[in-house]
Amino acid sequence: MRTGELGIYLSSLELYCELLKDSRDYYVICEDDVFFTPEIRKISSIVNNCPEDWDMIFLGTNKEYCKKENSDRSYSRLTGKCMPGAFGYIIRKKCAQYFVNFGFPMEEPIDGLFMRNFENLNVYEYSPNCVFVDYDDKSTTIHNSDEV
């Protein structure tokens, strides 16, 4: 695992622990290098219109790996065949507790942990994208950092 991936993993689990103590039911979590689309203003609507059983809602898709982009507002259930990208998502308290319980030992980046557990959770991808990452931008440090 790279140092940047380790940092995201640990800070994500720290946020999940904070959510468990918070009165809110969910957090919106984004990496620091995301770009927002106007769709981000609709977070409350996205949450309220998602199927009631949701645990996580991914807000952006890495088109390199998930070749689906829909201009209609829609929710797609994720099954573990595709990881949209952990750069922007909404996580419910129940799901945060799940990852706090099963997040250690750290064996892979956080998105690998997510994908490996899609079958145990109700995970959706919202379209169109609310956030995206410019993978061509050399300023991102996640994939350019040293191995731990």
Predicted regions and their residues:
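An acidic/histidine-cluster motif and surrounding catalytic segment
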Residues: 1-30, 34-148
